[in-house]
Each structure stands twice: as structure tokens, then as C-alpha cells.
Amino acid sequence: MMKKILQHLQFTINLLYGFNEIAFHLNPRLDQNYIARNTYLNGVWGDEEGFGLMKSPLLSGKGFQIMVFVSQDAYLVCVNGCHMFSFSHRVPPEKVEKIEIFGDIDLKAASLISSEVYPDSSIIKHKKNHETLHLPFFYNLEEDVKPGFKIEIKGKIKLLPVSFRVNLQSSEHVFPHPLIPYHLNVRYAPECYVVQNSWGFTGNNWDEEIRSPLPLSWSPGKDCEIDIYIYDSYILVKGEDWSLPVFKLRLDMDSVKYIYIQGDLTMTFFKITSFRRDEWDDIAAEQLK
């Protein structure tokens, strides 16, 4: 869908069935840098899901493209070729009969197409490495991930965060699901904790989570530093005076081609470098006993 936003505040895309039942309601609110998602069933709005944007790709007077991809489990939404969020099906998608678009936009085109991948590779617009630190952030690795690699990330946690994540994954696509040898997910709501996991070791699903308490330096509103150390058979994540539990690798790191960062973090620095195995080897060795 190609559209141009007029000088106003919001617009709506609805996927409808029956007598004005809304299986998926997408409502970008430009004045709030916020995109609402919901359903409207039997005359009642469901629980709203929201997505806040530090820098919105939807700007007054500027053209843009939205893609809504229907997967087995959810609607996947990208803007200008960049995946933004998903919305789990509350109504079987095959019930949808029509699309409704209205609000403060100048609609240029709308189409229904079939695709085997999402986002569509022909419209993916990842910047070259280091051109931008805006989230969602993709880094296309130019060589295989090897023991001795260190990933340095610096930024500031948003004041009212829900979560942010860092994936070391096999492809740039959201669908089909990439292999993810390492997944770091920092969660703030409804509970605060850190998850380390992988996707694809036990089949087409998430594997067993390793949970740990949230480091104080990753508290809402604080500047944070994330250092990820790659070893032969495990990964170690640490800050200035703490470390997460060692994550034993379940999948071959040779499959990692991209680093993906998304969520409630304003990133200010990203770098891949190497490290010498010194005192952090001692920490890992102690945990692995």
C-alpha cells in the first residue's frame, strides 16, 4: 500500500468480516508517535496493543509503504520494508472479507499479493552497516561469527519500557522464521527479568529459556551497556560489574548472518570487535563447573 499522509494526526486500516466485525485494527497516531492494534468484536473493543516510536517512519506530507503479512499465527506489519511488530490472531484470518482504509491520508495504491517471505526482499531497506542506529536495527555480518568476537551495544532504556531484544540469527526475514542461535530478551512488563534462549534447536519453536534477574544498570531511563562475548561453546553477556549466566550454545554459530536489535532502547553505539580471554574466562569457567 502506497500512501501519503496529509497534515493531520491519524489514519486507520481495518480488516473486516461479517457485520462490521474488525479482525485487525491498525491505527497509527502521528501526534503520539504511537501505533495501536486491536479487534472490534460483537460491539466491543478488545485489549489494545501499542507500539511507541522514538522516530516514526510515518511523517506528515511524506510517502510511505505499509505491508501487512498474514502468517499462521499473527499479522506481521512492516513500514518501508522494515518489520515493526506482530499482532497475534484473535479471529481466524480466513474470515476476513474486506479491507477498510480511512483517515488523514492520500491513498495512492492498495494491492493483495502472495509472498513466501516477509518482509519482501525487494523492498527491504536496511541501511548499510553503521549508517543508522535507529531501531529496528539489522547488521549484515560480513564474515562468520567466530570465538573471540565481541559485540558492543550502548544506549538508553526508555522510561516506560516493555522489552528489548538482541538476536544473532540466520536471515533478515521474519517469515519463514530464521534460526536464532542466541536470543537476548530484556523484559520489563508485566515482570522484570532477562531471558536467554535460542530458536530452532528442538524444532520450529523457541527452546528452553534461561531466566535471570534484571541488572540494575538496565533499569528504565538509565544509560546501558551490553557486551556480548562469543566463545567456542558458549556466550557470556556482561556489564561493568555484573554478568548474566553463561549461555551454552545449542546451534552452530556458522548460521548467524545478521544481528537484529529491536525494542524499547535508544541505541547510541554499536561495534563488533575482538577480545582477549582474561578474567571473563574465569567467570565462565566457574559457572560451567
Where are the regions that the model predicts?
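Peripheral membrane interaction modules
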Residues: M1-Q65, F69, D73-C78, C82-E225, ...
